[in-house]
């Protein structure tokens, strides 16, 4: 088996060599200070106003820099801003000074106007940003996005070249972390206007102000970064290169690790035991949850609450994560993930929710019986869209077997699609059911719960609940200064969502990584971008096999 895996790695490397992996050094070369990482899917854009998925966000976190970034404790720290915001007494006006040495990779200075331009672009209805709702706390953002006010009325103003004023609809306790999101990053107006709709579609149609810049992006193959010599803090960036290899097959990623072709790779469930004694193996639980979206618009039967509940309860999730992943993933019965935020008492918010969606074959059958009676039919058929990866294929087969075994008369078909195509179908509401996931962008339950409100671009299930919408509105408004009441309101909202079951939670994502012990300073985040690579360096005095100092 090991010989076969090695042959796979050699084959992959050979293909890369023949096609010319980069302009200078091979994608897999470990010469100098280079970090080589396998990623499970490609990014979709380099335009921060259009980003909706985790890989684009993660790469953006290395090549762009906003007012703030997340530290290793997932708290905001100054980046382009010189310090945390100065707040008015009512907490609704922020004054932010910018560092004068921040530059774009074309040499232009990063100015307050770059933030004004980018934020206005996000909420401009012409942009069609799926993340415009993230800016709802900024004064007039929702009205601008709805076309009811001009973009100039957005609550951001350049007081001078290096000073910003931000006006909020309401005081927001997590505003510093919110401003660390990629959606709030600046854009160079001159460059963005030059390329128009093509901005960010290729490596050379963008400029960068982060620690690194993209020099090579070959779709569904690789992304290569180099150190940004115009970055204000370049003297503290030790890596000269970052190479991402797109691989949908985790077994192939392990093969590349074994041949010293990459420094970090997620491995498949069946490989975990093989590496259980390896210094390279580490498991981490992310705050990402995976669930089945049930589209009531395309499948009218999904309007029946009992059918939705039956599907949620019919899946043995503990058995699923054990047999399919073996990587630290958790069976999930909640929508808001563990690790997202804490209650005023210091408890994990997710731990305070008693979900009705636990696996229960008997209850699932009872719900299905009620659904059949109310629907007046004994059979329901729908298609589940999943990503075209080996693990998602296995996942779909497992879910299909559970639903069809425990709910006789329900037939689930499976359609595998490239990630971008699957996502676009979701956003267009052109799907029946979709195996989807969500990672919180800031440390608050609303990072999840907001996405299921009526009209939210991520809520493409056609489910709508007025009470739920009001609870989220109150939590984002009048209750922001009342921690206890706000927490109780969000708990109630989560319970409504789970009892209505417009989505069927399946698992909270874990990852089993093989990481080169020479890699130092690597930070993983529970919220926001997956990693921070600014402080990473390769300590070649460490033995890659043992993790100990070389003799």
Residue spans for each PLM region:
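Gly/Pro-rich hinge or "lid" segments in bacterial periplasmic/extracellular proteins
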Residues: 168-237, 241, 251, 545
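Structural transition elements
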Residues: 331-371, 391-393
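Ligand-site clamp/hinge motif
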Residues: 229-274
């Amino acid at each position: 088996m090991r010989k076969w895996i090695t042959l796979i790695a050699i084959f992959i490397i050979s293909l890369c060599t023949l096609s010319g992996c980069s302009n200078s050094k091979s994608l897999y070369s470990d010469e100098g200070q280079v970090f080589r990482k396998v990623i499970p899917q490609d990014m979709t854009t380099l335009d921060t106003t259009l980003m909706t998925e985790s890989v684009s966000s993660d790469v953006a976190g290395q090549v762009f820099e906003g007012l703030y970034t997340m530290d290793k404790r997932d708290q905001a720290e100054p980046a382009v801003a010189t310090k945390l915001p100065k707040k008015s007494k009512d907490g609704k006006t922020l004054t932010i000074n910018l560092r004068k040495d921040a530059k774009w990779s074309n040499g232009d200075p990063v100015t307050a106007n770059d933030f004004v331009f980018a934020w206005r672009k996000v909420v401009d209805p012409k942009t069609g940003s799926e993340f415009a709702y993230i800016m709802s706390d900024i004064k007039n953002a929702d009205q601008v996005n709805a076309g009811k006010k001009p973009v100039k009325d957005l609550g951001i103003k350049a007081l001078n070249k290096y000073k910003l004023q931000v006006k909020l609809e309401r005081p927001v306790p997590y505003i510093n972390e919110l401003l660390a999101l990629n959606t709030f990053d600046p854009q160079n107006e001159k460059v963005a206007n030059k390329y128009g709709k093509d901005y960010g579609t290729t490596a050379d149609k963008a400029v960068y102000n982060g620690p690194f810049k993209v020099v090579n992006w070959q779709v569904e193959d690789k992304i290569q970064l180099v150190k940004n010599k115009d970055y204000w803090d370049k003297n503290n960036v030790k890596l000269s290169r970052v190479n991402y290899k797109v691989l949908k097959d985790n077994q192939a990623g392990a093969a590349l690790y074994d041949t010293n072709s990459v420094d970090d790779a997620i491995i498949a469930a069946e490989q975990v035991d093989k590496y259980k004694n390896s210094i390279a193996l580490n498991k981490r639980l992310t705050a990402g949850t995976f669930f089945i979206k049930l589209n009531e618009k395309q499948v009218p039967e999904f309007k029946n609450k009992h059918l939705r509940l039956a599907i949620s309860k019919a899946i043995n999730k503990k058995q699923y994560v054990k047999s399919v992943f073996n990587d630290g993933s958790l069976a999930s019965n909640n929508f808001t993930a563990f690790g997202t935020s804490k209650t005023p008492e210091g408890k994990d918010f997710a731990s305070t929710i008693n979900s009705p969606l636990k696996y229960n074959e008997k209850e699932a059958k009872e719900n299905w019986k009620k659904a059949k009676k109310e629907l007046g039919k004994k059979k329901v058929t729908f298609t589940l869209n999943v990503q075209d990866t080996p693990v998602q294929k296995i996942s779909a087969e497992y879910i299909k077997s559970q639903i069809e075994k425990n709910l006789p008369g329900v037939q689930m078909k499976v359609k595998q699609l490239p990630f971008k195509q699957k996502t676009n179908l979701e956003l267009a509401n052109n799907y029946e059911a979709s195996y989807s996931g969500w990672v919180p962008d800031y440390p608050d339950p609303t990072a999840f719960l907001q996405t299921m409100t009526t009209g939210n671009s991520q809520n493409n299930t056609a489910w709508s609940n007025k009470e739920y919408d009001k609870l989220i509105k109150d939590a984002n408004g009048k209750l922001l200064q009342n921690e206890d009441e706000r927490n109780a309101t969000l708990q109630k909202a989560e319970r409504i969502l789970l009892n209505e079951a417009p989505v069927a939670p399946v698992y909270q994502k874990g990852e089993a990584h093989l990481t080169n012990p020479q890699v130092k300073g690597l930070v993983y985040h529970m919220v926001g971008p997956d990693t921070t690579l600014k402080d990473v360096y390769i300590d070649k005095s460490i033995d890659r096999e043992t993790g100990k100092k070389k003799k």
